[in-house]
Amino acid sequence: MASKVSPSCRLVFCLLISAAVLRPGLGWYTVNSAYGDTIVMPCRLDVPQNLMFGKWKYEKPDGSPVFIAFRSSTKKSVQYDDVPEYKDRLSLSENYTLSIANAKISDEKRFVCMLVTEDNVFEAPTLVKVFKQPSKPEIVNKAPFLETDQLKKLGDCISRDSYPDGNITWYRNGKVLQPVEGEVAILFKKEIDPGTQLYTVTSSLEYKTTRSDIQMPFTCSVTYYGPSGQKTIYSEQEIFDIYYPTEQVTIQVLPPKNAIKEGDNITLQCLGNGNPPPEEFMFYLPGQPEGIRSSNTYTLTDVRRNATGDYKCSLIDKRNMAASTTITVHYLDLSLNPSGEVTKQIGDTLPVSCTISASRNATVVWMKDNIRLRSSPSFSSLHYQDAGNYVCETALQEVEGLKKRESLTLIVEGKPQIKMTKKTDPSGLSKTIICHVEGFPKPAIHWTITGSGSVINQTEESPYINGRYYSKIIISPEENVTLTCTAENQLERTVNSLNVSAISIPEHDEADDISDENREKVNDQAKLIVGIVVGLLLAALVAGVVYWLYMKKSKTASKHVNKDLGNMEENKKLEENNHKTEA
């Protein structure tokens, strides 16, 4: 027996079919959701009092409906249709708000809320839009370098997993790059994942670089739409190595050119301003037309003065692109004549010359026994004090370490010379006898006494300085005696004697010998006296000349006066004679 369907059920079924076909409603309403979030769609219908149930459906691309959720107003129960893509993802609230968890791109559909009464069906459509933020763009497949004046692929800017697809923009130093024929070419490509329906967008940039692009940052960005509107994400900056040809060559000298001296090692370094810099060059040495192929450095060892000249380097393939420099190898020669150890006799003449040859003006310093001399030594008559160690030293101040020195060890020899002096002590009880000796090598002194007498003290000797020293004894002779002083060195033996009266007999004392220092003082005083005398003589001579000129003029004047007086007297005598004749 067939079941009977009530008239009200038949009416509801007809209304649902007609609602599915006619799709009346309140108009379009859009819900934006982020990928992976929960989509919340309010029903947007006022719930009628005689509501029987509510349903949600979505429409396929061909317009056919697919029911997904049902809620009864009387039984307060919820039922979800067996739709695989929405299994365990749906939630229908009491106010008929539908929530879809874990939003997917496939959820981007037209959903419809349906409220059904016994006599009517009310619909409210909702359009769902799902957005997926893309990954941060990155520049991949980067060119290891870019060459000037060549259109070359710089790299790819890629942004993954976006929905809808984004738009990529390239920037140079923060400014947008636009396609320019022959200079900038941009190729855009997008791909969609069949499973996730997400887009991967790629933009390839071909760029013709110039030297102005050195250290310039390149970036890219992706612009996309999200639930709240348009947004942009930027990549990290990338700086590319720019290759460009060498336009200028420079040459450097190590060590610095003004400090090169004989014996140094010179390194020539040639540099090109290209990138990458040239690795090989041609080096040209003075007087050698053929170049030497080498790396960017060329070293000359133990250079001599003949290495002075012009040096040049050039590119291997462009000989006209070259650089040159002038190198001066500083030198310093010193010749001392005589040098080494020289033995001369006292009174001899010894010319000494220190000859300098240098690349620049050199300073010359003379030292004697480590004491600086005011002038170079000159020996017209050698003295014992001239003996010593002489050093001629020269240096170039501008060149560190360039100095030379030669030494002369002068030995002044002489036979012993003796002078004896005596002096009575003011007390009158003793006499001091001194034997002054000159000579080199140092003579040995011996005393002998002839006659009776006694030696009060032992022999006393002075220091041996500049070939001189003395020996003295103190005696108190009771009678006249003769003292003999003997001085002997490798050259000769010299003897001198001195008669000394008894202590009771007064006698004339002989002055001590003048020391070198006192002799110099005496010489200085003598020079001063001679200068004063010469000055006085010159003054007297000038005064005499002046006096002679004065007297000469005076005599000339007196002659004229006497002549006039004589003429007057003669005239007077003639007149007197005339008077006598007349008488």
Swiss-Prot record:
Glycosylated. Detected on brain motor neurons, in differentiating retinal ganglion cells and in adult retina. Detected on leukocytes and on lymphatic endothelial cells. Detected in spleen B cells and T-cells (at protein level). Detected in adult brain and embryonic spinal cord. Expressed at high levels in the brain, and lung, and at lower levels in the liver, and the kidney, as well as by activated leukocytes. InterPro entries: CD80_C2-set, Ig-like_dom, Ig-like_dom_sf, Ig-like_fold, Ig_sub, Surface_Rcpt/Adhesion_Mol. Residues 28-527 are extracellular. It is a single-pass type I membrane protein. Disruption phenotype: Mice are born at the expected Mendelian rate, are viable and fertile and display no obvious external phenotype. Unlike wild-type mice, that have tightly fasciculated and smooth nerve bundles, mutant mice have more loosely bundled nerves with many single axons extending out of the main nerve. Eyes from mutant mice display a variable degree of retinal displasia. Besides, lymph nodes from mutant mice display reduced weight and cellularity, but appear otherwise normal. Mutant mice have only half of the normal number of hematopoietic stem cells in their bone marrow. Residues 245-328, 333-409, 416-501 form the Ig-like C2-type domain. It is found in: Cell membrane; Cell projection, Axon; Cell projection, Dendrite. This is CD166 antigen. The chain crosses the membrane at residues 528-549. Residues 1-27 form the signal peptide. Homodimer. Interacts (via extracellular domain) with CD6 (via extracellular domain). Homodimerization and interaction with CD6 involve the same region and cannot occur simultaneously. The affinity for CD6 is much higher than the affinity for self-association. Interacts (via glycosylated extracellular domain) with LGALS1 and LGALS3. Interaction with LGALS1 or LGALS3 inhibits interaction with CD6. Disulfide bonds join C43-C113, C157-C220, C270-C313, C354-C392, C435-C485. Residues 562-583 are annotated as: Disordered. The CD6 binding site is located in the N-terminal Ig-like domain. Glycans are attached at N95, N167, N265, N306, N361, N457, N480, N499. Cell adhesion molecule that mediates both heterotypic cell-cell contacts via its interaction with CD6, as well as homotypic cell-cell contacts. Promotes T-cell activation and proliferation via its interactions with CD6. Contributes to the formation and maturation of the immunological synapse via its interactions with CD6. Mediates homotypic interactions with cells that express ALCAM. Mediates attachment of dendritic cells onto endothelial cells via homotypic interaction. Inhibits endothelial cell migration and promotes endothelial tube formation via homotypic interactions. The lineage of its organism: Eukaryota, Metazoa, Chordata, Craniata, Vertebrata. Keywords: Adaptive immunity, Cell adhesion, Cell membrane, Cell projection, Disulfide bond, Glycoprotein, Immunity, Immunoglobulin domain, Membrane, Repeat, Signal, Transmembrane, Transmembrane helix. Residues 550-583 are cytoplasmic. One of its GO terms (biological process) is cell adhesion. GO terms for cellular component: axon; dendrite; external side of plasma membrane; immunological synapse; neuronal cell body; plasma membrane; T cell receptor complex.
